[in-house]
Regions:
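Short, amphipathic alpha-helical interaction segments positioned at domain boundaries
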Residues: 61-100
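Short acidic DE-rich linear segments
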Residues: 107-114
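Short alpha-helical segments that sit at the start of domains
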Residues: 1-13
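Generic structural signal for hydrophobic core residues of well-folded globular domains
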Residues: 10-14, 46, 84-87
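Short acidic, hydrophobic short linear motifs in intrinsically disordered regions
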Residues: 16-33
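Short amphipathic alpha-helical interaction segments
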Residues: 32-59, 70-71
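Short, solvent-exposed secondary-structure capping/transition elements
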Residues: 18-19, 55, 92-94
Length: 114
């Protein structure tokens, strides 16, 4: 679900429905409930799958992966948009989030995914 929330927020930014705001982004993806290393790995996997771009990763202290770029530098790609709009499981997640979370629901309605 984290990937969906990230893609949804970045899509709303791309469509200029919203401007990137770190506090709003953190709340939208519920960053306070996600481990930092886990989130970085999600970003890495999303970039490897070409769903997002703009993430810069550096290995520090051995094998610890850190995000060297700002989250506001992340951008959704064409593949990310297609993933949001065509992936059946993601639509189901969108419907679930629409029913349960106000902020994410507002973003879903704003970009017209459900």
């Amino acid at each position: 679900m984290i990937a969906y929330k990230v893609l949804l927020y970045l899509y709303a930014c791309l469509e200029e429905k919203i401007s990137f705001d770190q506090r709003v982004y953190d709340k939208a993806i519920r960053k306070d409930q996600i481990g930092e290393n886990y989130l970085i790995n999600v970003y890495r996997m999303m970039q490897e799958k070409r769903l997002i771009e703009g993430a810069v990763f550096v290995k520090a202290w051995g094998n610890v992966l850190i995000l060297a770029s700002e989250e506001q530098d992340l951008r959704i790609t064409v593949e990310g948009i297609e993933y949001l709009s065509e992936h059946g499981r993601m639509k189901a997640v969108g419907k679930y989030l629409l029913e349960t979370m106000d902020m994410v629901a507002g973003l879903i309605r704003m970009v017209g995914l459900v």
